[in-house]
């Protein structure tokens, strides 16, 4: 990750107005986010699947520190997706089992830097797309309506530069 060519390539993305989805599954991936942010400050990044958060002990631990470091960069967003498969309990996960992590992330990044993702077709492995979206929407409904809209579609529209018209 520290090769000059990597940063040059990421700068090309940024210069073209494109974004970078960070598919992080461990600490070593996440520790690159602030480094990339420093080397390519104009690059917009999104952390896919909340970087596979821990579900076992209920504390943010190293994952939480990694997310705090990422959230320090205003060009980094968090994609709330893939949590059913990340939970390790593909059949038994529920909105209740992911609620705390989702709210923790929204509180950390703010609704304007969180976006909903479906993780289809992978979500099929953990109960399906409808189960995932229903669980996320149930959790988002505990937030003000403006935050629900922001997370459900407005953040993604702004981040990826798309419009409804």
Positions of predicted regions on the chain:
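Catalytic pocket-lining loop regions of alpha/beta-barrel enzymes
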Residues: 3-115
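Short, active-site-adjacent cap segments at secondary-structure transitions
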Residues: 85, 122-124
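Mid-to-C-terminal alpha-helical segments outside catalytic/metal-binding sites
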Residues: 103-104, 108-115, 124-165
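Active-site glycine-centered loops adjacent to acidic/histidine catalytic or metal-binding residues
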Residues: 119
């Amino acid at each position: 990750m520290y090769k000059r060519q990597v940063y040059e390539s990421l700068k090309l993305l940024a210069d073209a107005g494109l974004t970078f989805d960070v598919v992080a599954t461990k600490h070593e991936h996440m520790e690159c986010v602030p480094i990339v942010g420093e080397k390519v400050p104009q690059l917009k990044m999104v952390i896919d699947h909340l970087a596979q958060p821990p579900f076992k002990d209920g504390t943010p631990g190293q994952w939480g520190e990694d997310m705090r470091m990422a959230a320090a960069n205003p060009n980094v967003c968090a994609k709330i997706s893939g949590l059913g498969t990340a939970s390790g309990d593909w059949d038994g996960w529920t909105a209740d089992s992911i609620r705390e992590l989702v709210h923790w992330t929204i509180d950390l990044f703010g609704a304007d830097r969180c976006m909903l993702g479906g993780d289809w077709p992978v979500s099929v492995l953990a109960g399906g797309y409808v189960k995932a979206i229903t669980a996320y929407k149930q959790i988002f409904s505990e937030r003000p309506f403006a935050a629900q809209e922001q997370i459900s579609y407005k953040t993604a529209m702004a981040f990826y530069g798309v419009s409804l018209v």
